[in-house]
């Protein structure tokens, strides 16, 4: 039997619309929405901004102003892999014959120096819709689950 492939976006689709998920898995894909270049470009700019601070082992001022006491994840080559949609995070779940793959934007490390905190840049071209917090919360939980399956401590 083939391994069932999941991703944070596929799980989000299931949570939003189980029928849409079933249709997607059975050959009727949802049409792709327009992907505006501004949010995609901002995502890249934010990653580069955080990477500059990471290379100096410093926190970006946005995190300092928010009172964050930890640090940025320091392993840039590993983070680059985890950001890549073809390599990304991989959580094998042989007990249910499934694998979950996803690409993360960034990681923070709690002040204990061990606990990883998934971090995602939200750069939407429009105002957030009602209930967006739940969607993003679930997305971060899925990234946390994947990191735990990979052997990391997650907060």
For each feature predicted by the language model, list its residue ranges.
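Mg2+/Mn2+-dependent nuclease catalytic core
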Residues: 83-155
